[in-house]
Curated annotation (Swiss-Prot):
It is found in: Virion; Host nucleus. Transmembrane segments: none annotated. Keywords: Capsid protein, Host nucleus, Host-virus interaction, Late protein, T=25 icosahedral capsid protein, Viral attachment to host cell, Viral penetration into host cytoplasm, Virion, Virus endocytosis by host, Virus entry into host cell. Major capsid protein that self-associates to form penton base pentamers, each in the shape of a pentagon, situated at the 12 vertices of the pseudo T=25 capsid. Involved in virus secondary attachment to host cell after initial attachment by the fiber protein, and in endocytosis of virions. As the virus enters the host cell, penton proteins are shed concomitant with virion acidification in the endosome. The lineage of its organism: Viruses, Varidnaviria, Bamfordvirae, Preplasmiviricota, Tectiliviricetes. Pfam families: Adeno_Penton_B. It comes from the Viruses. One of its GO terms (cellular component) is T=25 icosahedral viral capsid. Disulfide bonds: none annotated. Induction: Expressed in the late phase of the viral replicative cycle. Interacts with the fiber protein (via N-terminal tail region). Interacts with the capsid vertex protein; this interaction binds the penton base to neighboring peripentonal hexons. Residues 7-18 have a biased composition (Pro residues). Residues 1-24 are annotated as: Disordered. This is Penton protein.
Length: 484
């Protein structure tokens, strides 16, 4: 019988491998394990330091402003508001070596950092940096001896920097006005009664008799109510480039409009009523009721010299009287706002920037200039106003004045307009209070350099030299899986 032979395979095809060959090859090739199973060595929540094995997200990144190792090599020309710090906390690395190291967060995850900051400042409330040590005034600079025609000029007056109470700043402002008069106006024929700008705290209308239209007690009530600005004709005060109006409690009703100036014309309806002349007054004879024309030193009160006010009013105009007793629709109350005095002169905010640590917000672009660093967090400048109630404030002021050897803040005690304003029973001071702020979770970069830039800028994006201590703690954690 003829034996049947298997048919030959088609041309171009190969037979399947034998069982022995398949089993033999599987022993020589390593088993492939997907990356998601490598959790024990390098998972989605792993943090890898250079030259170190992977770790889990149990680390913290500390941003320290005064590390001794960083000062000489990184921060010799910096300050506590703009500094570099090494975040690789290992004593084996110098700051220069740490700058070559990186902290790598697993690329398969989106990372966030819980950012907490500690900020301490030692900023005074009167300083050039905060535009709170100067203001502009328009004063009489000369008076012609022949024609008696006055000349007015603008002057920029500067206060000494320091941390003062509200009444101390008012005294310094008045002293600056008087010193300008002594240096300029007095030499050009200007009289003391023509000092046309005065900062006060009294309510000049107390004791006003609507029938006689005079202040019948014969003197203005020596009690503080609210800071005030008193102007003479032709004079003005400008707070456009000054924040002292916040200390006086005088603000614009529309704060975003450009410029802030108080002129004599703006204070319509705020004329200060004249005093009753007690030397000629007889209670039984009404014809003896006359306004006081001048003080004991012969300084005129300029009674009846403003045709818009009347014969029993001085030509001095008070912002406080114009605001409370003037026309609310067309007067100064329609343009300005009486607010609580802020002895900090208007505290501002500060911005935190961590350009090498946090991802840039979508509204910012990367920058190498501190004034343009992307902002990742913000908080108020840690400067607070403290108010105290002192029932003996005026007594303390008079006692201090009696014990002083000079009357530098009360040069004209005989004149009821120019005398030193009384101190308020509510005394305010500014105080630097350390702040601890939780800024929440911010998106982190997956590759973090070993040396970080940290910048704290003010509202004008300037580096603040008054920052005394700035610390930051960032705790990384996984937010979600990265999707593409």
């Amino acid at each position: 019988m003829r034996r049947m032979m298997p048919a030959a395979p088609p041309q171009g095809a190969s037979p399947p491998p034998s069982y022995e060959s398949v089993v033999g090859s599987s022993l020589t090739e390593p088993l492939y394990v997907p990356p998601r199973y490598l959790g024990p060595t390098e998972g989605r929540n792993s943090i890898r330091y250079s030259q170190l094995p992977p770790l889990y997200d149990t680390t913290k990144i500390y941003l320290i402003d005064n590390k001794s190792a960083d000062i000489a090599s990184l921060n010799y020309q910096n300050n506590h508001s703009d500094f570099l710090t090494s975040v690789v906390q290992n004593s084996d690395f110098t700051p220069m070596e740490a700058s070559t190291q990186t902290i790598n967060l697993d690329e398969r995850s989106r990372w966030g950092g819980e950012f907490k900051s500690i900020l301490t400042t030692n900023i005074p409330n009167v300083t050039q940096y905060m535009f709170s040590n100067s203001f502009r005034v328009r004063l009489m600079s000369a008076r012609d001896k022949e024609t008696n025609a006055p000349t007015y000029e603008w002057f920029t007056l500067t206060l000494p920097e320091g941390n003062f109470s509200d009444i101390a700043v008012i005294d310094l402002m008045n002293n600056a006005i008087v010193e300008n008069y002594l240096a300029v106006g007095r030499q050009q024929g200007v009289k003391e009664e023509d000092i046309g700008v005065k900062i006060d705290t009294r309510n000049f209308r107390l004791g006003y008799d609507p029938e006689t239209k005079l202040v019948m007690p014969g003197s203005y009530t020596n009690m503080a109510f609210h800071p005030d600005v008193v102007l003479a004709p032709g004079c003005a005060i400008d707070f456009t480039f000054s924040r002292l109006n916040n200390l006086l409690g005088i603000r614009k009703r529309y704060p975003y409009q450009e410029g802030f100036m108080l002129t004599y014309e703006d204070l319509a309806g705020g004329n200060i009523p004249a005093l009753l002349d007690l030397t000629t007054y007889d209670q039984e004879n009404s014809s003896t009721i006359k306004p006081l024309k001048q003080d004991s030193k012969g300084r005129s009160y300029h009674v009846g010299e403003d045709p818009e006010a009347g014969d029993t009013f001085t030509y001095y105009r008070s912002w406080y009287l114009a605001y409370n007793y003037g026309d609310p629709a067309t007067g100064t109350a329609s343009q300005t706002l009486l607010v609580s005095p802020d002895v900090t002169c208007g505290v501002e905010q500060v911005y935190w920037s961590l350009p090498d640590l946090m991802q840039d917000p979508v509204t910012f672009r990367p920058s190498q200039t501190p004034s343009n660093y992307p902002v990742v967090a913000t908080e108020l400048l840690p400067l607070r106003s403290r108010a105290f109630y002192n029932t003996q404030a005026v007594y303390s002021q008079l006692l201090q004045q009696a014990t002083n050897n000079t009357l530098v803040f009360n040069r004209f005690p005989e004149n009821q307009i120019l005398l030193r304003p009384p101190e308020s029973t509510i005394t305010s001071i500014s105080e630097n209070v350390p702040s601890l702020t939780d800024h929440g979770t911010l998106p982190l970069r997956n590759s973090i350099p070993g040396v970080q830039r940290v910048t704290v800028t003010d509202a004008r994006r300037r580096v603040c030299p008054y920052v005394y201590k700035s610390l930051g703690v960032v705790t990384p954690r996984v937010l979600s899986s990265r999707t593409f």
